[in-house]
UniProtKB/Swiss-Prot annotation:
UniProt organism field: Oleidesulfovibrio alaskensis (strain ATCC BAA-1058 / DSM 17464 / G20)
Signal peptide limits: none
Alphabetical list of PANTHER family matching this protein: DNA-DIRECTED RNA POLYMERASE I SUBUNIT 2
Biological-process GO terms, alphabetical: DNA-templated transcription
Protein name stated in the entry: DNA-directed RNA polymerase subunit beta
Family to which this protein belongs: Belongs to the RNA polymerase beta chain family.
Family matches, as Pfam families: RNA_pol_Rpb2_1 (PF04563), RNA_pol_Rpb2_2 (PF04561), RNA_pol_Rpb2_3 (PF04565), RNA_pol_Rpb2_45 (PF10385), RNA_pol_Rpb2_6 (PF00562), RNA_pol_Rpb2_7 (PF04560)
CC per GO annotation: DNA-directed RNA polymerase complex
This enzyme's EC code(s): 2.7.7.6
Domain of life: Bacteria
Catalysed conversion reaction: RNA(n) + a ribonucleoside 5'-triphosphate = RNA(n+1) + diphosphate
Transcription listed as a keyword: yes
C-alpha cells in the first residue's frame, strides 16, 4: 500500500508524460532499425551503406556492391565493460558482392564476367544501453542532441544596417544538409547577386543562364508583358489586358461602340472604366507618343527585312529607338510590365551587368569564380556546375530540407533531394515579392527553422564520413591491382570507419562524460539540446537573439533551465511532454477544441504547424461538459498572448507543466519564484549528492516518481508477476506472459552495491519487495541512489527558522544543528578508484609484491601475501594500497653494498618502491579490489581467492534462478494435475514413508513438497500425462539454457583478461569515503536559495519552540526579498502545516483514540474522494500502519502553475493549530530567553551539493616546482601552492610589509638556493632570513639574451656590497 498523499492539483491531466529517455533510445533504435521486419533502404545504417555502395573503379571494369549487414552479440556485458575499461560494442558483418565486367572497347557495353559474394567482418559499433548511454573505454558517456539551423530556405533582411542610406536589403539562403550553400542578396542599387559557398558574388542572372535560360526566358519568367502598337498615323496604342490594370491618366477620350465615353482625357483610369473598356471589346487605347520612353523591351526586336537586331531584350526604350522602329516598319513592341506595378526592374538591371552571352560562358564564369586557380574548359565547367546542385552524390537537401523548401515556397511538385531550376526561380520570385512589398523576414530563431539532430543522426553522419574515406581507398586499390584475382575482403578495410567512430565517441564536443551525480542529473543530461558542436554555433559568435527565450519555445524548450555561464541559452532542455518528430522538429501536445468543447483527442504540433492556431492555457476554466466557462479565454496566437472569444479557440494545453523541463517541474511553487532564481534552483538540484538515507520531500510536485521511474536508477517490473527471491544482492522474478521464454519467464536482477558513479558518488540499490509478493507492470522493485519508494529524494526535510543569529548567517551563510552531523542526516558516501599497473620495462618486469625495500612492517600490516590491501581496511593518506617494485638501472655500489656482495656472493636486489599510495585528502574504507591478469600469466593467491568468491556467487545465483523456475513450473502445472488420479503410489523422503497410494487424487499439499520431475507419467489420464510431459520438456530446455548461461559466466571469471601490450598485471582498489556535513559545504533549497555552512551549532544552543523542540537550520531572512523567490516561503508554510498535521494524526493513534474518529479526521484533512474511498477500503492494521507513516509529515504534491493557493495553505495551517502568518515564538537555546519578535518557521527541503569542502581543502609546505620558473605548481591535483598575484603584492606594498613581501617572493617561491638554506635554518632553529636571487629574474635575463641584450651584474669600485645590473650591447657599449 502506497503512502497517503495530498494532491493540490486541480487540472486533470489526460496524457501521461512520455518516457523521458525516448529521444535517445528511439533515435539509436531507428539508426540500427532494431525490431524492424524489413530494413528501410534509405534509413539508418542501411541507408548509409546504400548511399556509398556500389563502388566502381575508374574504368568501370569492376563494381563492389553492398547486399546486407548483420550486427552480432556483444562479447562483454555492460558491467564487465565498466569494470575492465572496455567499450560496450557489437561486431558488424557485411555481405558484399564483387562484380567484374568485360568492357567492349568499341561500344563501351559491359558484360558480367564474374561475381564473388562474401561475408566480411566490418569492425564494431558501440551499442546504447537501455538507459540511453554509451560505455566507451569503461566510462558511461552521453551523446548530447544538437540543435542546429534546419536545412531549407531562409529569407532575411539587414534592417537597414548595412548601407549608409539605411535602405533595407533583402537576401535569401538555401541551406542543404550536404553540399554548397546558395545565397542571393540585393545591394543598395537593387542589383541581385548570387554567392555559392560564400565565395565572391556575381550577378544572379549568370546562374539563370548556366541553368539554360536565355535573356528573354529570364525576363519572361519574372515579368509580365505589355504590348504597344506603332500606328502609321503616328499614334501609340496600348493593348488592353485584364491583368495589367494601371491607374494611369487617359491621354484621349475612350468611347464604346455607341459613342458613349467610358474614360475622359486627363482623368485616371478606374477599375470600373477598365472593366467597361474590356467588356466593350476595345482592343487598345491611345497613349502619349513618348509614353514608353524609359520602359524596357521584353524581347529582341529584329528587322525582318534585313535580319538585323535593332534592340535586345531588357534594353531601355528611347525616343530615338521609337523613331527607328517606325522607320523599319515595326508595328508591335513588347515591353516589360514594371510601370505602376509591384514588380521592380531589379532583374532587368542585373541582366545589364551580366556580360555572359550563353549557357557555356555562364558555366565557365561560375567555374572561374569558384576555382580561380585551375584553367576552365567548357566540359569541365559544365560537369562542375551539374555536380554543384544537381548531383545527389555531392548535394543533398535531405527530406527535411525538401519539406521546409516546399513549405516556404508553396511547392508541391517535387520530392527530389537535389535543387531544381523551379526551386531557384521560385525562391527569387518570393524574394522579389518580399523586397518590392517590404515584407517581413523569416525568424531564424523560430523553432520551425531550427531542428534537433539526435544521436542516431549524428552517428549516421560519422559512419557516412568513414565510409566515404574507405570508398577512396577501395577505388585506388581497384585501379592498382588486377581486380579479377581479388576477393571482396582484399578490397575492404574497415579501419577508416572505426577511426572516425572512435574519434566521435571519444573526443567529439557532443560526446560527453555523463553527469551521474544523481538520477535527475542523468536524465537531464540525456534530454539536453546543445547549439554548440560541429556544424553548430560557437559561444563567442552566438549573439543575444539566438540565446534568448522565443515564443515558439513554449511547450518545446524550457525557458528556465540553462547554464549560467558563457553557454547561457546555447544549452537548453526539452520540456516534459516534448517529442522530436521524424524531421527533427520539436513537437508539443495539445487537446483539440471543437465548437468550444475541449475533447480528449491529442494532437502533437511542431512550431510551424502551430502558426495560426488559437491555443488556450491549461488552466482555462471548464464546466462539467468540458466547455469554457468564461466568454473570453486567455490564448496564444502567433506568439502573442491575447483574450479570444471561446468559439475561436482551436487547441488547449495538456498540462501547466508542459512549458518547463523536468528539473524546473520539480520546484514547488515555481510560479512564485523569480526566473533567475528558478534557473539556479533547477541547475542545483542536478548537483545534489545522494545521501546515506534518502528522504522524499514533504512538499513535492508529483514529477518525482516520473523522474525516478525513467532514470534507469531503479529496477522496474517489466510485466505482471511474482517475486521468487529477494535480498540485498538480487531479486528473482517470474513474469507472466511471453517475456523471457528461454528461462521460463524468470529474470534475475543483480542489485548494484557500492558502485562508483562517474562523479564518484555512491550508486547503490535497495530492494522494496519481498519474497512471494505479487507485482504489477511498472512497479518499482528496487530504489536507486537518491530515491525513496520510487520517488526522487535528493535532500532532507528540515525545520527551518528565518532569523539572524550572531552574524553566522550573514550573506547567505547557513547555521545548522549538530543533530544533522550526529544522526548522519547529510552524510554521503563517495567512492574513489585507484589503479596500479605492473609493466614489462627495459630493465625487467615490475612486480606487485609485499616485499618492498625500506618499508616498515606497520606500513604493510593491511597488505596480504600478494602485496594487495585487504577489503575492510581503514586507510588514510600515504598508506600503501598495492605494493609494487620497479627495477632500477645499474648504479655505483656503495662500500657497504660491496662488502655485502663480497660476503654473500650475490647482487642485492636493485629495485625502487613505486607502490600505490592513498593520496592526500582521502580517508576511508577499502570496499573492493579487482585484479586483472594476462590470460597466460600465473595467478597469485589473491586472484584465486577473488575467483573462488565470484564462482560461489554465480553458483548461488544459478541455484536461485533454477529454484524460481521450478516454483513457476510447479504453479503452472498445479491447475493441470491437482485433483487427478495417480497411476502409482508416491513414496516420501524417509524410508518406508508413503505420501499417497495408487488411485488417490493428488492434492495441492502433496504437490508442494514433490520434485516436478516425479510428475512425469504419474497419472491415469493420458491427456494429463501428455500436458505434464510437454511442460517438463520445456522445463528441461530452460534449465539447460540457464546452465549454459552461467557456465559461460564462470568461464569469463577464470579465463584471464585482455590487457594492453606490455602490461603484466593491473589492480584497481575502491575506497569508500564517508563525508559528513562540515563547515564550508555548500547547501541549497530548490528555489535558488544557496549558501555555505558557516557554523555547526550544538543542538542545545539552537533556537527552540515553546515545547522544547529545536530547529534544524537557521537562514537569513534578508536572502528572500531581494531574490524574489517567495516560493521558498510558501514551501516552508505548507511543509510546516503538513508536518504538524501528520504528527497530530499519529498522536491521535498513540493517545488511544478510536479508529473510526481517526479515519474521519484523515478524510477531513485530505478532503479527496479518492483518499476517502482508499481509507474506507483499508483494514485496521493497514490503516494504522499508513497513519504511523504520517508521523514525519503528510507528503503533499503541488504541481507547478497548478499548486496550492494561499487560502489552502492558511486553511491547512489553521487545521494543524498553527498561526496563519506562519510565524511562531522561538527561544534562544543559549539563554532560554524568548526572542523579541515572532519568527517565520516551517519545513523546507534542503539539498547538500557536490561542492564539498573536504574535496576542495588543500595545504602544502613543500612540493613540486615548475621546471623553468622554479615556482610552485598550482592546483590541488598538482599538490601546488597558493598563488600570490600582482594585486596581493599591491596590498602588501600598501601596508609596507617589506619583509613579508621579500619572503613571499623569494624563499617561499623561486629562490632555489635560498629555500634550501631556509630549510636548514628552520631545522637548526635559526630564524634569520637570507634571501637570494629569484629564478624568474634569471628567466627574464635569458629572454633578454634571446633579444640580443646581455645582462650582467657589476660591482662598483669602492662599494663592497652594492650591486648594480648593467646591460652590454653587441657593439660593446654599456650603461
Amino acid at each position: 500500500m502506497g503512502q497517503l498523499t495530498k494532491k493540490f492539483g486541480k487540472i486533470e491531466v489526460t496524457l501521461p508524460i512520455p518516457h523521458l529517455l525516448n529521444l535517445q533510445v528511439d533515435s539509436y533504435k531507428k539508426f540500427l532499425q532494431e525490431g524492424a521486419a524489413a530494413l528501410a533502404p534509405d534509413e539508418g545504417l542501411e541507408g548509409v551503406f546504400r548511399s556509398v555502395f556500389p563502388i566502381e573503379d575508374f574504368n568501370r571494369t569492376a563494381s563492389l556492391e553492398y547486399v546486407s549487414y548483420e550486427i552480432g552479440e556483444p562479447k562483454y556485458d555492460q558491467a564487465e565493460c565498466i569494470s575492465k575499461g572496455l567499450t560496450y560494442e557489437a561486431p558488424i558483418r557485411i555481405k558484399v558482392r564483387l562484380v567484374v565486367y568485360d568492357v567492349d572497347e568499341d561500344s563501351e557495353n559491359r558484360t558480367i564476367r564474374d561475381i564473388k559474394e562474401q561475408d566480411i567482418y566490418f569492425g564494431t559499433l558501440p551499442l546504447m544501453t537501455e538507459k540511453g548511454t554509451f560505455i566507451i573505454n569503461g566510462t558511461e558517456r552521453v551523446i548530447v542532441n544538437q540543435l542546429q539551423r534546419s536545412p531549407g530556405i531562409i529569407f532575411e533582411h539587414d534592417a537597414g544596417k548595412t548601407h549608409s542610406s539605411r535602405k533595407v536589403l533583402y537576401s535569401c539562403r538555401v541551406i542543404p544538409m550536404r553540399g554548397s550553400w546558395l545565397d542571393f542578396d540585393y545591394d543598395h542599387k537593387d542589383i541581385l547577386y548570387v554567392r555559392i559557398d560564400r565565395r565572391r558574388k556575381m550577378p544572379a542572372t549568370i546562374l539563370f543562364k548556366a541553368m539554360g535560360m536565355s535573356r528573354s526566358d529570364i525576363l519572361e519568367y519574372f515579368y509580365k508583358k505589355e504590348y504597344y502598337t506603332l500606328e502609321d498615323d503616328g499614334r501609340l496604342m496600348w493593348e488592353l489586358d485584364k491583368d495589367l490594370y494601371r491607374k494611369d491618366v487617359a491621354y484621349a477620350d475612350v468611347a464604346d461602340g455607341e459613342g458613349k465615353v467610358i474614360a475622359k482625357a486627363g482623368k485616371p483610369y478606374t477599375k470600373r472604366s477598365w472593366r467597361l473598356m474590356l467588356e466593350a471589346g476595345i482592343p487598345a487605347v491611345e497613349v502619349a507618343p513618348d509614353y514608353i520612353a524609359g520602359m524596357f523591351l521584353a524581347e529582341d526586336i529584329v528587322d525582318e527585312a534585313t535580319g538585323e537586331v535593332l534592340a535586345e531584350a531588357a534594353d531601355e526604350i528611347t525616343l530615338d529607338l521609337i523613331d527607328r522602329l517606325r522607320e523599319c516598319s515595326i508595328k508591335r513592341v513588347p515591353v516589360l510590365h514594371t510601370k505602376g506595378s509591384d514588380t521592380s526592374s531589379s532583374i532587368r538591371d542585373t541582366l545589364l551587368l551580366d556580360k555572359t552571352a550563353d549557357q557555356e560562358q555562364a558555366r565557365v564564369e561560375i567555374y572561374r569564380r569558384l576555382r580561380p586557380s585551375s584553367p576552365p574548359t567548357p566540359e569541365i565547367a559544365s560537369t562542375f556546375f551539374e555536380n554543384l546542385f544537381r548531383n545527389p552524390d555531392y548535394y543533398d537537401l535531405s527530406p527535411v530540407g525538401r519539406y521546409k523548401l516546399n513549405q516556404r515556397l508553396g511547392l508541391t511538385t517535387t520530392q527530389e533531394r537535389v535543387l531544381t531550376d523551379e526551386d531557384i526561380l521560385t525562391a527569387i520570385r518570393v524574394l522579389n515579392h518580399l523586397k518590392d512589398t517590404h515584407g517581413p523576414a523569416d525568424d531564424i530563431d523560430h523553432l520551425g527553422n531550427r531542428r534537433v539532430r539526435p544521436v542516431g543522426e549524428l552517428v549516421e553522419n560519422q559512419y557516412r564520413i568513414g565510409l566515404v574515406r574507405m570508398e577512396r581507398a577501395i577505388k585506388e586499390r581497384m585501379s592498382l591491382q588486377e581486380v579479377s584475382t581479388l576477393m571482396p575482403h582484399d578490397l575492404i578495410n574497415p579501419k577508416p570507419v572505426q577511426a572516425v567512430l572512435k574519434e566521435f565517441f571519444g573526443t567529439s564536443q557532443l560526446s560527453q562524460f555523463m553527469d551521474q551525480t544523481n538520477a535527475l542529473s542523468e536524465v537531464t543530461h540525456k534530454r539536453r539540446l546543445s547549439a554548440l558542436g560541429p556544424g553548430g554555433l560557437t559561444r563567442e559568435r552566438a549573439g543575444f537573439e539566438v540565446r534568448d527565450v522565443h515564443t515558439s519555445h513554449y511547450g518545446r524548450i524550457c525557458p528556465i533551465e540553462t547554464p549560467e555561464g558563457p553557454n547561457i541559452g546555447l544549452i537548453v532542455s526539452l520540456t516534459t511532454y516534448a517529442k522530436v518528430n521524424d524531421f527533427g522538429f520539436i513537437e508539443t501536445p495539445y487537446r483539440v477544441v471543437r465548437d468550444g468543447q475541449v475533447t480528449d483527442e491529442v494532437k502533437y504540433l511542431d512550431a510551424s504547424s502551430e502558426h495560426g492556431e488559437v491555443v488556450a492555457q491549461a488552466n482555462a476554466r471548464l464546466d462539467g461538459d468540458h466547455r469554457f466557462v468564461d466568454e473570453f479565454v486567455t490564448t496564444r496566437v502567433r506568439g502573442d498572448v491575447i483574450m479570444s472569444p471561446r468559439e475561436e479557440v482551436t487547441l488547449m494545453d495538456i498540462s501547466p507543466s508542459q512549458m518547463v523541463s523536468i528539473s524546473a517541474a520539480l520546484i514547488p511553487f515555481l510560479e512564485h519564484d523569480d526566473a533567475n532564481r528558478a534557473l539556479m534552483g533547477s541547475n542545483m538540484q542536478r548537483q545534489a549528492v545522494p545521501l546515506l538515507r534518502s528522504t522524499k520531500p514533504i512538499v513535492g510536485t508529483g514529477m518525482e516518481a516520473d523522474v525516478a521511474r525513467d532514470s534507469g536508477a531503479c529496477i522496474i517490473a517489466e510485466a505482471d508477476g511474482v517475486v521468487r527471491y529477494a535480498d540485498a544482492d538480487r531479486i528473482v522474478v517470474s513474469y507472466e506472459g511471453d517475456l523471457y521464454p528461454r528461462t521460463g519467464g524468470v529474470r534475475s536482477y543483480d542489485l548494484q552495491k557500492y558502485h562508483k558513479s562517474n562523479q564518484s558518488s555512491c550508486f547503490g540499490q535497495k530492494p522494496l519487495v519481498s519474497r512471494g509478493q505479487v507485482i504489477r507492470k511498472g512497479d518499482v522493485l528496487a530504489d536507486g541512489p537518491g530515491i525513496e519508494d520510487g520517488e526522487l529524494a535528493l535532500g532532507k526535510n528540515l525545520v527551518v527558522a528565518f532569523m539572524p543569529w550572531c552574524g553566522y548567517n550573514f550573506e547567505d551563510s547557513i547555521l545548522i544543528s549538530e543533530r544533522c552531523v550526529k544522526e548522519d542526516v547529510f552524510t554521503s558516501v563517495h567512492i574513489e578508484e585507484f589503479e596500479v599497473v605492473a609493466r614489462d620495462t627495459k630493465l625487467g618486469p615490475e612486480e606487485i609484491t609485499r616485499d618492498i625495500p625500506n618499508v616498515g612492517e606497520d606500513m604493510l600490516r593491511n597488505l596480504d601475501g600478494s602485496g594487495i590491501i585487504r577489503i575492510g581496511a581503514n586507510v588514510k593518506p600515504d598508506d600503501i594500497l598495492v605494493g609494487k617494485i620497479t627495477p632500477k638501472g645499474e648504479t655505483q655500489l656503495t662500500p657497504e653494498e660491496k662488502l655485502l656482495r663480497a660476503i654473500f656472493g650475490e647482487k642485492a636486489r636493485d629495485v625502487k618502491n613505486t607502490s600505490l599510495k592513498v593520496p592526500p585528502g582521502i580517508e576511508g574504507t577499502v570496499i573492493d579490489v579487482k585484479l586483472f591478469n594476462r590470460r597466460s600469466g600465473e595467478k597469485d593467491e589473491r586472484t584465486r581467492n577473488i575467483e573462488d568468491y565470484e564462482l560461489a556467487r554465480l553458483d548461488q545465483k544459478e541455484k536461485d534462478h533454477i529454484r524460481a523456475l521450478t516454483e513457476t513450473t510447479r504453479e503452472k502445472l498445479a491447475p493441470v494435475v491437482v485433483g487427478k488420479q495417480l497411476a502409482y503410489g508416491l513414496a516420501g523422503q524417509k524410508k518406508g514413508e508413503v505420501i499417497a497410494e495408487a488411485g488417490q487424487t493428488l492434492t495441492a499439499e502433496m504437490l508442494e513438497g514433490l520434485p516436478v520431475k516425479k510428475l512425469s507419467g504419474l497419472f491415469k489420464s493420458k491427456d494429463t500425462n501428455e500436458a505434464v510431459q510437454q511442460a517438463l520438456e520445456s522445463y528441461d530446455r530452460q534449465i539447460e539454457f540457464i546452465n549454459a548461461m552461467y557456465e559461460s559466466k564462470r568461464e569469463k571469471v577464470t579465463e584471464g583478461d585482455d590487457l594492453p601490450p606490455g602490461v603484466i598485471k593491473m589492480a584497481k582498489v575502491h575506497i569508500a569515503v564517508k563525508r559528513k556535513l562540515n563547515v564550508g559545504d555548500k547547501m541549497a533549497g530548490r528555489h535558488g536559495n544557496k549558501g555555505v555552512v558557516s557554523c555547526i551549532l550544538p543542538q542545545e544552543d539552537m533556537p527552540f519552540f515553546a515545547d522544547g523542540r529545536p530547529v534544524d537550520i537557521v537562514l537569513n531572512p534578508l536572502g528572500v526579498p531581494s531574490r524574489m523567490n517567495i516560493g521558498q516561503i510558501m514551501e516552508t508554510h505548507l511543509g510546516w502545516a503538513a508536518k504538524e498535521m501528520g504528527r497530530k494524526l499519529a498522536l491521535m493513534l498513540e493517545h488511544g483514540q478510536d479508529l473510526a474518529s481517526v479515519r474521519e479526521q484523515v478524510k477531513t484533512v485530505f478532503a479527496s474522494d479518492a483518499i476517502s474511498s482508499e481509507v474506507d477500503n483499508m483494514d485496521d492494521e493497514t490503516f494504522v500502519r499508513s497513519v504511523r507513516r504520517l508521523r514525519d509529515g503528510i507528503v503533499t504534491k503541488t504541481p507547478v502553475f497548478d499548486g496550492a493557493t494561499e487560502e489552502q495553505i492558511w486553511s491547512w495551517m489553521e487545521q494543524a493549530g498553527l498561526a496563519n502568518d506562519g510565524k511562531t515564538e522561538l527561544y534562544d537555546g543559549r539563554t532560554g530567553v524568548r526572542f523579541h519578535n515572532r519568527v517565520t518557521t516551517g519545513v523546507m527541503y534542503i539539498l547538500k551539493l557536490h561542492h564539498l569542502v573536504d574535496e576542495k581543502i588543500h595545504a602544502r609546505s613543500t612540493g613540486p616546482y615548475s621546471l623553468v620558473t622554479q615556482q610552485p605548481l598550482g592546483g590541488k591535483a598538482q599538490f601546488g601552492g597558493q598563488r600570490l598575484g600582482e594585486m596581493e603584492v599591491w596590498a602588501l606594498e600598501a601596508y609596507g610589509a617589506a619583509y613579508l613581501l621579500q619572503e613571499f617572493l623569494t624563499v617561499k617561491s623561486d629562490d632555489v638556493t635560498g629555500r634550501v638554506k631556509m630549510y636548514e635554518k628552520v631545522v637548526k632553529g635559526d630564524n634569520f632570513l637570507e634571501a637570494g636571487l629569484p629564478e624568474s629574474f634569471n628567466v627574464l635575463v635569458k629572454e633578454l639574451m634571446s633579444l640580443g641584450l646581455d645582462v650582467t651584474l657589476h660591482q662598483e669600485e669602492g662599494k663592497k656590497r652594492t650591486k648594480r645590473a648593467g646591460m652590454t650591447f653587441g657593439d660593446g657599449t654599456s650603461y
